[in-house]
Amino acid sequence: MKRKVYWKDLFASFTHSKGRFLSILTLMLLGSLALVGLKVTTPNMHRTANQFIQQQKMLDLAVMGDLGLDQADQEELLGVKGARVEFGLLLDLTVKGTGEAIRLFSPPKSLSSFRVTKGRLPKKEGELALASFWEDRYQIGDTLTLEEKAGTRSSLKRKQFTIVGFVQSSEMWSQKNLGTAMSGSGNLDAYALVSKEVFTTKLPAMARIQFDDLRSLDSFSQVYQKRLEAHQEELEKLLKDNGKARYQRLKQEADGQIQKGQKELSRAKGTLQSAKSQIDQDQQQLDLQEAQFKELAPFLPAKEQAASQEKIHQAKEQLDQKKKDWATGETELAKKEEELKKAQRERDQLEIPTYHVYDRKTMPGGQGYLMYSNASSSISAVGNIFPVVLYLVAAMVTFTTMTRFVDEERTNAGIFKALGYRTRDIILKFVLYGFFAGTIGTLLGTLLGHYFLSGIISNIITQGMVIGESREYFYGDMTLIALGLSFVASVLPAYWVSRKELKEEANLLLLPKPPVSGSKIFIERLHFIWKRLSFTHKVTARNLFRYKQRMLMTIFGVAGSVALLFAGLGIQSSVGGVSKRQFQEILSYELIVVKKTNASSRESKELTNRLEKSDIKDYRPIYSKVVEASLKGGRDKQTITMMVTDRTDFSPFVSLRSLKQGEPLSLKKGVIISSKLAQLARVTVGDRLTLDDHTFKVAGITENYVGHFIYMDQASYQKIYGKQTSANSYLLKLKNPSTQQVQTVSQDLMDLAAVKAVSQNASMISLFNSVAKSLDTTMMILVVVSILLAIVILYNLTNINVAERIRELSTIKVLGFHNKEVTLYIYRETILLSIIGILIGLGGGYYLHQFLIAMIAPDAILFYPKVGLGVFLFPVGGMLLLLILLGIYVDHYLRKVDMLEALKSVD
């Protein structure tokens, strides 16, 4: 049988129903755009990062010791099997005149190489290659003068350098948040490369390690992470006793030098004592000679008298010289004694050094890598949830659309069947319609997702990072998944509906589809209500339940759009609500000052005097330490800050309060942990938690959104650790908490000999802002997608409703109903169903929002669970506005319809 008429009819179905075709196409476009765009962003970022890591041969782990790495440490690390190990020097200084902190590195041989963006690497002692983000402040050939902290031993041969190039570090990805420093204000501002010959010490500060079995792995994969953790544990075990051994070596070396100094001092004292005795004897001899000369001088000839005087004069000069030499010796002896005492003090102040094994996220300057990893993980989590809901809504609407399409083509289907066409041929027409609409929309959405949406999201994340913009790749598997979902959402409904509707014989198909039979609804049984309803309201009530499929599709279509809109806006609200609560209400201090444990009483007094100055509003001495632990619910090792006070709380520096009720918590009851830590450790109040090789009972869980904290008083610490502790840090509140003032006070404190480090909240704020920025942009895009989805859904369902009931509308119009009444006759149903959908959508959106913020939050961040009033009002207002605009469109459309033509019989 020739199919010319068949194909002509198929083509006509495309051209005569452009709105329907475009609506299905748009739904599939939006679904595939969100799915592909969100799902390929993370792999694009990971592939770009992996290429950068491979090119720069970035380290896997770094080992740093409090006192550097001596020969024994180096030999032990070089013995690690299956690893390449390189040692490097680094030093924190300040830029003269600005007080900004800069970290000098010695050039690495091959691991974690620096990328030259302009100029060249330093070759001589007086040359320096500066961080590329300072290229707008300095030029090649400029001189940079650096300063070391006052009162410290000089670690550089020179302080003045000529800039010969600009570089980017493969370890410090962020160009804004470089972490903490031991100079300046406590925050690192820049870094540079200098020749290793510039350093006075040859003792390396760090070891860079790259493992053979990790080199070819995706650095963001679970396989890489598990192997890395295993290597990290091996290194930690290897270095476990190095601190004690190093302490013993240093102590023995110091004891040897002190003993040697004591011997030299004893010899010097003996020599000086002998010299003093000799001087005394010479003085007596001289006094005797002078006395004899005075007695005999009158009797001596002039010549002999002159000779005797000359002899006495020479003896006196010799004695004076001996006295001078003795005085010089006494001064030098006093210096030697002071040096010996200083050496003894340093020996007594020696502490067991700690060896730290860092990964790329936790190493100094690794904040950029951490931000990059967190942001990509959050985007991936959104991509696992958001498109699923979107496709589900799209599938429901497509089902309704195809049902209406089959009803419209019922007569044509009967004609084709009467002409001898098989049922499957007729069904194929609808399947092809859904296939082409879905496939074209999916392919367009896939291309936009691959090369537009993913680029926008990733470029926002990588702004200010040395890694540069993410490259865009095409993923065949994601395209196939999108096409598969399109098949399910657009082709299967077409097949299922057409198969169900076209089972009848040709003669029945040529007749109009029998109207849906009415039935008595529940509200009719409530006579006291039913009798008060007008005719049109009764019709509306009956029709709502008469067309159950359309009713459900409208409700759930609107509900799905509102839920997606609520979730997107809710995440923006949750992200925006964190910063103020965390850094103004919960952590209200500006600085943490870490004191040197070996500070002298004079140095400690200087620090106390500085803390008492008027620019510091209040301060609190505490004991603090950092603990690293692997938790059940965490992807990586978590960094936890422990704070111990001698009071019952940390007020007014830290607000300890419950997350839900906001009730104040007291340290009298025991240990209090932060909410995200409790979530990852999967503990509640009353449970026991093991950290830092010690187990304690959780007495309270405090509200906290960024970072992990453990709070306790002295009594709890002593009970857990079996020892008392003394304050080693200070929490500071400033009278003027402006950024400039925080920097000024930080620099003043860092200049004090008793201060080891100053920590600002800036690092935590930067960590949070990096995630917040990427999520905010992503949510903005998804909010736009949700709005477009709502427009398509309501427009589509409204058109279907009007088209299905045009004869009914024509009837009531010719009966004398006014235009407004005709419009409301049908549109009142849409309004009621949409309102129900909005209410359901708000409820569903709330739970979707709660689920999303739990899924997408990085390990160190908890998003604020509550949302602002605008999150409720915007979806409601937006949908109501859309209903009004569509109502105007429907009214305009119904005014132009030829009612008499619509009433003509199709029999």
State what each model feature region is:
Residues K2-K4, L502-I521, H892-D907:
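Short cytosolic juxtamembrane segments of multi-pass membrane proteins
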Residues R3-L392, V578, Q582-L591, T702-V785:
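Membrane transport/envelope proteins' first extracytoplasmic loop
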Residues N728-K733, S746-A854, P858-Y889, A902-V906:
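C-terminal transmembrane helical bundles of large multi-pass transporters
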Residues F535-K668, S675-K676:
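Juxtamembrane segments of multi-pass membrane proteins
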Residues H16-N44, D60-A62, F435, L443, ...:
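Short, strongly hydrophobic transmembrane alpha-helices
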Residues M1-L33, V431, S519-G560, N801-E804, ...:
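N-terminal Sec/SRP start-transfer signal
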Residues F399-R404, E409-T411, F435-I467, G476-K503, ...:
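Small-residue-rich transmembrane alpha-helices
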Residues D9, T15-S17, M396-F435, D776, ...:
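Interfacial "coupling" helices/loops that link adjacent transmembrane helices in transporter permeases
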